[in-house]
């Protein structure tokens, strides 16, 4: 007899803005960021098993599938928290580049929480999934919501913001270069320099006031893009800087490092400009290019069935 199963997309993210105002006494960094889901995505397939075993397979041999993978950790966290006696077989079709600042692992973990909540019929109380998600990683709670969300504190205090309707969606190109840098190395490099002391990026302040007032005003994203990691990472890996230069030379209205890198995204005026640029950009060896669009919270929740 076939076991109950479920397949869900697992979307990537970019950061419209990412500021690190300082480091807290507990060693964690303060974060001010504006996160956005985009259409680039993995696929996760779940099938119940007769025992409590959690197994993971992946079509990308570079992705570890053992107990350290966030997908497996998410499943075990649910089993332990709610004393689940069922198991799960999970298959990951990996399309989001790994260790590229696009939140792939965090997205996979969040989608696993949502899928197993349904397949294992857990029905947790309010906030319990978010609590588990926050323990798995700073970006995991965001992927329970999707869309455009402001994150502050250590990155787990979330404030959803008005998402643009489909006609105003943003057309993007993401480039992932061959060079990479770990999140830990990025933070270490940032710590060696003065952290942000200026006021919050205008996009954060304006967006928060819109959320509070219930009125949305057009954003000039290309004028507000900011990432505190850019200067240090561009110095460490000049190849990553060249991806931004390539996007701007191809006509991007603005371009920015995604998260702590190594991917860079560019914003284009529309679908035609996006397609033209994707065909014209001269890719260096090992570079990967991903044309995509923003995914609103409504679209996101519909896609993952929440």
Protein language model regions, located:
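ATP-binding N-lobe of GHMP and related small-molecule kinases
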Residues: 1-100, 118, 122-130, 152, ...
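Residue-level signal for inorganic ion chemistry
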Residues: 16, 44-46, 71, 105, ...
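Short beta-strand scaffold segments in enzyme catalytic cores
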Residues: 42-46, 139-143, 149-150, 264-266
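Glycine/serine-rich anion-binding loops at beta->alpha junctions
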Residues: 91-120, 138, 253-268
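Short, basic/glycine-rich phosphate-binding loops at helix/coil junctions
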Residues: 50-62, 112, 134, 215-226
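Hydrophobic C-terminal alpha-helix "anchor/cap" residues
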Residues: 35-38, 133, 246-247, 281
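Contiguous, small/hydrophobic- and glycine-enriched helical/loop subdomains that border
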Residues: 87, 109, 113-150, 154-157
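Conserved, helical-rich catalytic subdomain that frames metal- and/or nucleotide-binding sites
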Residues: 145, 150-254, 269-306
